[in-house]
UniProtKB/Swiss-Prot annotation:
E.C. no: 7.2.1.1
Organism for this UniProt entry: Haemophilus ducreyi (strain 35000HP / ATCC 700724)
Entry's Gene Ontology cellular component terms: plasma membrane
Gene that this polypeptide is encoded by: nqrF
Origin superkingdom: Bacteria
Membrane topology annotation: Single-pass membrane protein
Molecular function per GO: 2 iron, 2 sulfur cluster binding; electron transfer activity; metal ion binding; oxidoreductase activity, acting on NAD(P)H, quinone or similar compound as acceptor
Top-level class of the enzyme under EC nomenclature: translocase
The protein, known as: Na(+)-translocating NADH-quinone reductase subunit F
Pfam family, one: NAD_binding_1
Ranges annotated as spanning the membrane: 5-25
Length: 409
């Protein structure tokens, strides 16, 4: 046999072996393998052991530790902040829009962005260990306005979600396809759906998703969770954009369907003071407003002065009217007001008109003796929130008295 041929075979074999060694070495460094340990809060009883791989958010969830993530782990909401003292690697560019330089130095990271490659040491808020997961049953899912449904869920018998007014839960959904033409919507709300042909949309989701929703129910409403969910249709200027994944899924739910939720989460809680409370809401931002106001007046029997200012387009978009009318009749310390931005002729509306921040200012705060001493609780569309905050700042209201829930709008 030709010596050159034999030499060639030997050289080729040697090259393959060298490459194999390099690949195995690289794999040992770059590919997650084996079990790792995550030490939590320096408490041996809280530590977990699991295979390396995936993200910290998912690793914790696999062991029943649920960190809040309104965007479902996409890195866009910034809620899943945890302190990683060691083992988390370098902070990623995707995290820097939510984590300041000071926080980064202190070890703060987004759990949804931290790769689980080696053992690590993390710190989690103690309240996270009270978060649980439940499979609930849909009681009802009814339209309260043209683009808002009230989803009412039954908690499993013998269980309860120990939430505070202003809190929220997360809903999960498996891959699915939703056809808008199958939505059950009363005829009184068809006008806009027909006008913009919203029936044509289809939401196709190929992955497990999670989203957060503020609760409209309050703690005394035992055994149920109630949400106000606005359908996220594509904006008029982008009619071909995909509709909202989770809102489409929720709108497709019917009585008897099973839904997985986790919680409770939250920080949009009422301060324990005697200061006047001013609630400002719009759209699906009604949810935490209802929860707070019902809790203050029905459960706590609060005597604090409070008012609720709600903005809607037309009378058709108003809901829970009888509930708030009754609360107003039963409580001398509570008043509520609605402003319609675009009332219809058939509304025969003689109440406030215009945007809610202007109505609140012109009809109440402008002549208030000390608006800076009130506490302002708000939830609504981003444009409304920005307008209200700007107005309050012009009145000298400090940040500590402006409480905002970003979910409900």
């Amino acid at each position: 046999m030709d010596n050159n041929f034999i030499f060639g075979i030997i050289a080729f074999t040697a090259l393959v072996l060298v490459l194999a060694v390099i690949i195995l070495f690289a794999k040992s460094k770059l590919v997650d393998s084996g079990d790792i340990t995550i030490s939590i809060n320096d408490d041996p009883e809280k530590g977990i052991t699991l295979p390396a791989g995936g993200k910290l958010l998912g690793a914790l969830a696999s062991k029943g530790i649920f960190v809040s993530s309104a965007c479902g782990g996409g890195g866009s909401c910034g809620q899943c902040k945890v302190q990683v003292n060691s083992g988390g690697g370098e902070i990623l560019p995707t995290e820097l829009s939510h984590i300041s330089k000071k926080e980064a130095k202190e070890g703060w990271r987004l759990a949804c962005q931290v790769n689980v490659k080696s053992s690590m040491d993390v710190e989690l808020p103690e309240e996270i260990f009270g978060v649980k997961k439940w499979e609930c049953t849909v009681i009802s899912n009814d339209n309260k306005a043209t683009f808002i449904k009230e989803l009412k869920l039954q908690i499993p018998e013998g269980e309860e979600v120990p939430f505070r007014a202003g809190g929220y839960i997360q809903i999960e959904a498996e891959p699915h396809t939703v056809n808008y033409k199958d939505f059950d919507i009363p005829k009184e709300y068809h006008e806009d759906w027909d006008k913009f042909n919203l029936w044509r949309y289809v939401s196709k989701v190929d992955e497990h998703i999670i989203r957060a929703y503020s609760m409209a129910s309050y703690p005394e409403e035992k055994g149920i969770i109630m949400l106000n969910v606005r359908i996220a249709t594509p904006p008029p200027r982008q009619p071909d954009a995909p509709p909202g994944q989770m809102s489409s899924y929720i709108w497709s739910l019917k009585a008897g369907d099973k839904v997985t939720i986790s919680g409770p989460f939250g920080e949009f809680f009422a301060k324990e003071t005697d200061n006047e409370m001013v609630f400002i809401g719009g759209g699906a931002g009604m949810a935490p407003m209802r929860s707070h106001i019902f809790d203050q007046l029905k459960r706590l029997k609060s005597k604090r002065k409070m008012s609720f200012w709600y903005g809607a387009r037309s009378k058709r978009e108003m809901f829970y009217v009888e509930d708030f009318d009754q609360l107003q009749a039963e409580n001398d310390n509570f008043k509520w007001h609605v402003a319609l931005s675009d009332p219809l002729p058939e509304d025969n509306w003689d109440g406030y008109t215009g945007f809610i921040h202007n109505v609140l200012y012109e009809n109440y705060l402008k002549n208030h003796e000390a608006p800076e001493d009130c506490e302002y609780y708000m939830c609504g569309p981003p444009v409304m929130n920005a307008a209200v905050i700007g107005m309050l700042k012009s009145l000298g209201v400090e940040d500590e008295n402006i409480l905002l829930d970003d979910f409900g709008g």
